[in-house]
Amino acid sequence: MTSTEPAAPTPRRRRGRPGYDQPAILRAAVELFNRKGYDATSVGDLARELGLTKPAIYHHVTSKEQLLGQALDDALDELTAAVTEASRERAGTTAYERLRAMVRRSVEVLVAHQPSVTLLLRVRGNSEVELAALERRRWLDDRLAALVADAVAEGALRDDVPPKLVSRLLFGMVNSLVEWYRADGAYDPATVADAIITIAFDGLARYEP
C-alpha cells in the first residue's frame, strides 16, 4: 500500500528589510524567547541583549512577531525538507526503510537547529503565526503516520498500535532531545539516532510466532 502524499503547507511570506546583522538579531531573539518566553520578551529586551537601540532593531524587522515567524519557518522548512526527502519512494526501498530514514533525519535536523526547533515545540497557537506553525507541524505528523501505515501494510511493523499514535510517540522521542541534548555532551547525533531507532523499532517489529 502506498500513501498519497499531500502537498506541504506553503510557508508564509516573510517581510522585513534585510540587513547584515539580521541573522544575529534572529539568533538573539530565539535565545531570549526560549529563555524568557515569547510573551515575556519585548523588543526592548532584545535591543539591550544586543547593545542596540530599539530603532536599530526596527530598521531590520517590523515586530517581534516577525522574528518569531522567521524562527519557526526556519525550523519547519528544515523539518519539512527532511521528512519529504526521507519519505520519497525510491526503487528498491521499503516503507520501513524510509520510516527509519525519516526518524534519523529528524534527529539530525533537531540537533543542527536545536534553538529554533525548541521554540517551535513551545508554541501553543496564541497568534496567527503560531497557528500557521502548528498547521505545518500537523502535516509532518500526518506524513509520519502515513509512512507508519505503509510499513504496517508491508508486514514490517506490528498492526495492533494505531499509526497516528506511533507517529506521535516517535516524534515524542525525537523532540525530547531539546530538553537534554548538548552538542558538547557525551553523544553525537548518529549515536542518538541509532539509539532511538533501535529502541523504537525493536519494540514495533512484527515477529512471527
Indicate where each model-derived feature is located.
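Hydrophobic alpha-helical connector segments
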Residues: 70, 84-113, 167-170
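Hydrophobic/aromatic-rich alpha-helical bundle segments in the mid-to-C-terminal region
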Residues: 117-122, 130-134, 138, 152-199, ...
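Helix-turn-helix
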Residues: 24, 28, 32-66, 70
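Short secondary-structure transition hinges
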Residues: 66, 101, 107-146, 164-165
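Short, structured helix-loop boundary elements
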Residues: 22-23, 43, 65, 69, ...
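Short amphipathic alpha-helical elements of helix-turn-helix/winged-helix folds
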Residues: 28-32, 70, 109, 143, ...
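Short, basic, alpha-helical segments at the C-terminal edge of helix-turn-helix-like DNA-binding modules
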Residues: 73-79
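N-terminal intrinsically disordered/low-complexity leader segments
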Residues: 1-20, 87, 208-209
